[in-house]
Amino acid sequence: MVNPSVSRLRTGGVEELTVTGRRSGQPRRVPVIPVQVGTHRYLVAPFGESGWVQNLRAAGEGQLHGHGQPEHFVAHEIAVDQRAEVIDGYRKIAGRSVERCFRSLPDPGDHPVFEIESRLDAAAG
């Protein structure tokens, strides 16, 4: 089931995040917009401390379904002082659909950001 407030993010680059629910143990799906900054990819939480954020923190891994095969990844939350550049890149990609979120919650600390690393990359590193 997709969160209706997040479904408004349907723009180019939207992928479906699947992460195990921290309480239910069941797969939870939500649309996200991965953003690349340099050679790293990230997931940004425009709505703040949402369910998918808490689930991803607990699980430490998930899957992205977008173009072709699902991508299994590990996730590492980045420190607040490292979020600004990633959030700026995200806002450019996501556009007006998320601007209200960032006006309401302007502090980068209100928007968890996870660096995602493909399981294949993680195994090699």
Functional labels for PLM-detected ranges:
Residues 2-4, 29-30, 101-103:
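A generic local structural motif
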Residues 40, 47-122:
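Short, structured beta-strand-loop surface elements
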Residues 1-11:
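Short, small/hydrophobic-residue-rich motifs at membrane-helix boundaries and re-entrant hairpins
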Residues 12-46:
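Short beta-strand segments
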